[in-house]
């Protein structure tokens, strides 16, 4: 039971962290700066610290300022949602798959629920609104 609680806690924490990445856009002056930002974020550092380290800027709109044309998150319709779902499922739900494969644990239902949660989280429930409209 404790293992399920830990997994659920990690999933919720990851989804909250992913929300910040979806709502903000990172603009960088060069590709190398974007790569530095990405590597920094992989260490678990905050968006602000990584932006300061790499020379990138965090913007709330959809357009990067002049000179910062190398953006991380391109906002082209459903591309953002698909990127979110793919990233969420691979990073959060991948741990469940690894657990299943390495420890012979039956967590097929948990993996399915995890991918559904990622989908709902990334679309912010907009699919349900469309279905009921």
Swiss-Prot record:
Record-annotated disulphide pairs: 27-64, 28-56, 40-50
Q: Which domain of life is it from?
A: Eukaryota
- Give the subcellular location: Secreted
Which keywords does UniProt give here? Disulfide bond, Plant defense, Secreted, Signal, Toxin
Q: Which residues form the signal peptide?
A: 1-24
Tissue specificity statement from the Swiss-Prot or TrEMBL entry: Expressed in flowers.
Q: Which GO terms describe its cellular component?
A: extracellular region
**GO BP, one example?**
defense response
This protein's record includes keyword Cell inner membrane: no
Protein name, UniProt field: Thionin
What species is given as this protein's source?
Brassica rapa subsp. pekinensis (Chinese cabbage)
Q: What is the lineage of its organism?
A: Eukaryota, Viridiplantae, Streptophyta, Embryophyta, Tracheophyta
Gene coding for it: THI2
């Amino acid at each position: 039971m404790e293992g399920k609680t830990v997994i659920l806690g990690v999933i919720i924490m990851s989804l909250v962290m992913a929300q910040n990445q979806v709502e903000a856009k990172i603009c960088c002056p060069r590709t190398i700066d974007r790569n530095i930002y990405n590597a920094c974020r992989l260490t678990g550092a905050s968006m602000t610290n990584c932006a300061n380290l790499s020379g990138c800027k965090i913007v709330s709109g959809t357009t990067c300022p002049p000179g910062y044309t190398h953006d991380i998150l391109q906002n082209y319709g459903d591309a953002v949602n698909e990127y979110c779902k793919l990233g969420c499922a691979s990073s959060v739900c991948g741990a469940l798959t690894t657990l299943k494969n390495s420890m012979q644990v039956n967590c097929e239902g948990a993996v399915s629920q995890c991918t559904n949660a990622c989908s709902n989280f990334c679309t912010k429930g907009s699919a349900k609104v469309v279905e009921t409209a």
